């Protein structure tokens, strides 16, 4: 194997792929990146056995084909530290990788390409082409509500549900739920659900950087695959049953509050400073045309904010974890937001005013 490549051309796919590679690995080969030269294309592959990412780059010069694995982190650090306009020459000689650039020379240890595990590919049952920017928005609007290390392992991921002309993302940690839908060219009538693990979905969002570009998504029995011109991303799916999210969406709330998103966000942020550091509880008191927000903590410190809102219902007092409310307001983009409530023991439904492709549910807190 022997090829030359500009530093920039190598660094971009290398940084993408190195993001998947975990530093602490039980198998030494999993800390490595697989380099494969075929014709005038170099592909780089990283995996942690759950997520696999292949980055592709065209070589300008004719190259000698071959395949080898080298430590991902070290190769990336070397490339980062070279001058921007460096031309890198890489060849394999007697189980070592020799890298030359200008007056710099590096020799890296290698492991054979045969040792590198591949994610098993099953048949794909459903394929669709989506705009990268729309899929990224879908993920970013819902990923914050995923659980982190819940024993209910199916919550440590995101539900992707396809039905005719619609792709929907749902995530929940049992205390709050986020849901966002987009139109998608899907012919299939039946609903099809998959759960993508947390690391996989966050990694996928990181890859969708081309505002004009498309991405092809394949949903299989045990895998999801996303392909663009520059990369192929594969993730195993979580084997489990996601909760019936439609049962969680509050129905029939009769108290509608409309307020300025930024003003609410700032008021919640200020009040949060004096909320209980562990439970983060704040109290909302609604009356006609106004919302009072209160917090206190074990040190008997108190914060209170008053904010004007559009509200005409009866008065109501309800408690929430302020972090959950701030997370929701943080992903919304409209000037006005809707808050739909029914009573102090029922969940709140939050939506952007004038846009119902996203819905957020937050359970109340007893204060």
Spell out what each predicted region is:
Residues 1-367:
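Structural preference for solvent-exposed beta-strand-turn elements
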């Amino acid at each position: 194997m022997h090829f030359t490549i500009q530093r920039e051309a190598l660094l971009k796919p290398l940084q993408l792929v190195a993001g998947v590679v975990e530093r602490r690995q039980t198998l030494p080969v999993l800390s490595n990146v697989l380099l494969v030269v075929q014709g005038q294309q170099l592909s780089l592959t990283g995996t942690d056995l759950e997520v696999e990412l292949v980055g592709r780059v065209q070589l300008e010069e004719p190259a000698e084909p071959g395949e080898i694995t080298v430590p991902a982190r070290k190769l990336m650090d070397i490339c980062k530290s070279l001058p921007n306009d460096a031309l890198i020459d890489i060849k394999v000689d007697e189980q070592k990788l020799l890298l030359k650039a200008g007056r710099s020379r590096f020799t890296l240890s290698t492991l054979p390409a045969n040792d590198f595990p591949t994610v098993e590919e099953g048949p794909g049952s459903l394929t669709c082409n989506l705009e990268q920017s729309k899929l990224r928005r879908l993920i970013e609007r819902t990923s914050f509500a995923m659980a982190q290390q819940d024993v209910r392992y199916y919550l440590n991921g995101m539900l992707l549900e396809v039905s005719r002309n619609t792709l929907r993302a749902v995530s929940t940690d049992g205390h709050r739920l986020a849901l966002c839908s987009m139109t998608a060219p899907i012919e299939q009538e039946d609903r099809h659900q998959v759960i993508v693990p947390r690391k996989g979905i966050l990694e996928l969002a990181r890859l969708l950087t081309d505002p004009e570009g498309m991405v092809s998504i394949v949903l299989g029995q045990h895998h999801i695959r996303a392909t663009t011109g520059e990369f192929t991303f594969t993730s195993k799916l979580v084997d489990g049953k996601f909760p019936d999210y439609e049962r969680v969406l509050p129905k029939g709330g009769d108290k509608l509050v409309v307020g300025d998103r930024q003003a609410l966000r700032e008021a919640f942020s200020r009040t949060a400073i004096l909320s209980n550091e562990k439970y983060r509880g704040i109290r909302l008191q609604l009356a006609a045309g106004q919302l009072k927000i209160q917090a206190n903590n074990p040190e008997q410190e108190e914060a209170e904010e008053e904010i004007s809102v559009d509200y005409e219902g009866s008065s109501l007092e309800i408690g929430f974890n302020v972090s959950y409310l701030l997370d929701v307001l943080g992903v919304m983009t409209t000037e006005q937001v809707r808050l739909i409530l029914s009573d102090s023991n029922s969940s709140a439904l939050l939506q952007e005013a004038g846009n119902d492709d996203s819905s957020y549910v937050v359970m109340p807190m007893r204060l």
